């Protein structure tokens, strides 16, 4: 992992990675450790953040309802912030904690695409943002609306894992990873 430490407070954040080479996936989570002398309250806990420095992307998300689960929604990533999530206490077929960021011409057999699956059955938030110089960011984690976790000195908090995969051969290859 990669350890980040605030030299003033002593708060530590460990970016944890797992590599499952035979499955062509990477896992990512975050551990926050309170090495301070007092309580720390976490108000947001993202498991991952991905940045693309250039490119024109779309993202695929899935929503659903009774007898129509996993309805595909393909949306251009425009300037500003776009989000999917759930504040119902659980993830579900209404909004699935899975997304694909892809180039505009990506299809089943060609094109670059990145899959992100949040391994969590609670409230979640996935956000994309395209900034003023056309960089794209994707953040995924626990939904912050009802989240507040107190860490006493010495205590830690682990975010749920995110599973990441990539394909330069379209959605078909990505779905087999």
Model-flagged regions — what are they?
Residues 118-122, 163-177:
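Acidic/glycine-rich phosphate/pyrophosphate-binding loops and surrounding catalytic core
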Residues 1-131, 135, 145-147:
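Polysaccharide-binding surfaces and accessory modules of carbohydrate-active proteins
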Residues 20, 39, 153, 168-172:
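Generic detection of long, well-ordered alpha-helical segments
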Residues 138:
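Glycine-rich phosphate/adenylate-binding loop
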Residues 149-168:
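Short Pro-Gly-centered flexible turn/kink motifs
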């Amino acid at each position: 992992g990669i350890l980040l430490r605030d030299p003033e407070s002593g708060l530590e954040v460990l970016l944890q990675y797992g590599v499952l080479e035979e499955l062509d996936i990477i896992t990512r989570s975050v551990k926050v450790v309170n090495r301070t002398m007092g309580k720390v309250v976490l108000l947001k806990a993202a498991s991952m953040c991905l940045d693309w420095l250039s490119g024109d992307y779309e993202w695929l998300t899935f929503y659903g309802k009774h007898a129509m689960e996993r309805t595909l929604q393909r949306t251009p990533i425009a300037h500003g912030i776009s989000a999917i999530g759930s504040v119902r206490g659980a993830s579900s077929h209404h909004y699935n904690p899975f997304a694909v960021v892809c180039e505009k011409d990506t299809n089943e057999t060609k094109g670059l695409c990145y899959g992100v699956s949040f391994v969590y059955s609670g409230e979640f938030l996935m956000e994309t943002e395209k900034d003023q110089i056309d960089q794209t960011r994707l953040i995924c984690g626990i939904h912050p609306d009802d989240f507040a976790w107190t860490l006493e000195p010495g205590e830690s908090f682990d975010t749920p894992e995110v599973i990441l995969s990539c394909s330069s051969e379209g959605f078909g290859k990505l779905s087999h990873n």
